[in-house]
Amino acid sequence: MARKKAEPKKTAKPNNNAYIEGAGLVADEKITMSLEKNYMPYAMSVLVSRAFPEIDGFKPSHRKLLYTMYKMGLLNGKLTKSANIVGATMRLNPHGDGAIYETMVRLSQGNEALLHPYVMSKGNFGKAYSRDMAYAASRYTEAKLMPICQELFGDIDKDTVDFVPNYDNTTTEPTLLPATYPSILVNANVGIGVSMASSVCPFNLSEVCETTIGLMKNPDFNALETLKGPDFPGGASLLYDEEELDKIYRTGKGSVKLRAKYQYDKESRCLEIVEIPATTTVEAIIEKIIALVKAGKIREVSYIRDETDINGLKIGIDIKKGVDPDKLMQKLYKLTPLQDSYSCNFYILVHGYPRIMGVYDIIKEWVAFRMDCVRRRTSFDLAKKKDKLHLLKGLGKILLDIDKA
């Protein structure tokens, strides 16, 4: 009798549909609760991690770059390739090389975006006042720290600020830089976060230091006596408004008006714009004037060209015969970005929280920060001296009784 073939065992099919409790259910929730739980943490993380400057005057991306350059020995050393700096900065800043290099460009001397640049540059770093003058790739340019950075890093190795681990716990980085002057007010700082934006205008370094000394000696000191107004790197004239400046100094909010500077070449009937507001670019001005000429709103201009070269910014405007250049400029100020407003919104991170502060409050916070740095430096130096004194006392005992030793 023939045997029956054994039937193959049926294997159970895997269940790919895993059960998730609560999946597919729609729960009602007040929008205020949802915003508090989801939106606010996201907004705060953007503000704290990249958008707003802190009391030392730097955003995290600026601080990571400058500290990396300091550790590379670029404060007193020779220029090195920008690509090398960008690669080293990635140990602290987990972003693409493009974003890091763009940060370096803005901090550089060649870009002319800052009143007191932090990076000495060699090569083409573009110009802040021109969209078309793009910066060269990082492999073609070189950089090192400017001498002013000595005031940022002079005490950093004396426990003046806290250090935290980097993103992968392989090294540490400072939470702040122990700047010996109020750098937050010396260079412009613009940051756009979520639902909030910061715009800190720059002031003259000497005037900021005089104002700080004045407020330290007398809390009722009038900042307008020494701090005459913002000082922008591109020049341009500041239309002085004492009431508006006083409002900015006390509240941190307001605006200042900037006006381009020009000179007139009578022989060639040419207006030469040599300084423009920091809020605009050469291309934006030329495009606006061309649009006004085409629209028939300006008939006095025969030709306009960009004459910017290695010697600096210049816009040439040829005018028709019999036109008064001063009257034409007044018209251009009114209709073009040759006169523009710089909005001030002094949002600064203090102990991890965004605060809007005027010049008085900013200097007060900076003085408190600097006093803490000096106190910590003094404690560090004292501990070192005590250790040395202990060794010297031991050495003294040995020398006084050398036979027993």
Indicate where each model-derived feature is located.
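C-terminal interaction appendages of subunits in large macromolecular complexes
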Residues: 2-15, 22-26, 30, 190-192, ...
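Catalytic phosphate-handling regions of large nucleic-acid enzymes and associated NTPases
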Residues: 2-252, 314-316
